[in-house]
């Protein structure tokens, strides 16, 4: 990114603190976001790893992940996930942002931490509701709720993986998601 700054116009920005604050906010969000859109880094996971019966297919086209399947609680199951293992070296990220649309259902963002011995039963989560129109979501790490036993502390440099999940009840999954990033 190249930024040309005309010093003669700097005075205008200093006289308009709201403009300056807005520009700094936009610049900081774009400069420090960690994009997580590489389809090669994501994988589908279902409760079949523990004997469940849920099914999931993942497709990626034109920068959009498509999750389609069925969550069923049969045989003590009940989840499908689009999951990405990550390795962050600093603690500067405050949350996850993405755009999603789907079949007017509730989905969850799951964060699993390093050092947790019992995934997928121990994680942090936040629910979000989708509609048939694209919506932008920003979920702060501070707003995540602990599920299960959590020995590790929530810091962005302590994240093991991030998942978008259909969870906990019988329903059809039909979700499109894009522009996934840490902010």
Model-derived regions: residue spans:
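N-terminal secretory signal peptides that target proteins for export/translocation
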Residues: 1-18
């Amino acid at each position: 990114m190249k930024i040309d700054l005309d010093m003669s116009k700097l005075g205008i920005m200093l006289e308009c603190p709201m403009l300056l604050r807005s520009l700094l906010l936009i610049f900081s969000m774009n400069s420090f976001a960690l994009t997580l859109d590489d389809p090669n880094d994501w994988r589908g996971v279902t409760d079949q790893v523990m004997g469940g019966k849920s099914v999931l297919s993942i497709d990626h086209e034109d920068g959009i992940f498509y999750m389609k399947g069925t969550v069923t609680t049969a045989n003590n199951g009940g989840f499908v996930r689009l999951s990405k293992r990550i390795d962050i070296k600093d603690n500067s990220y405050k949350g996850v942002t993405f755009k999603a649309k789907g079949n007017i259902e509730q989905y969850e963002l799951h964060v699993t931490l390093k050092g947790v011995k019992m995934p997928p039963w121990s994680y942090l989560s936040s629910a979000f509701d989708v509609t048939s129109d694209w919506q932008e979501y920003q979920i702060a790490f501070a707003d995540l709720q602990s599920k299960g036993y959590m020995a590790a502390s929530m810091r962005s440099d302590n994240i093991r993986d991030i998942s978008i999940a259909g969870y906990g009840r019988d329903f059809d999954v039909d979700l499109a998601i894009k522009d996934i990033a840490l902010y």
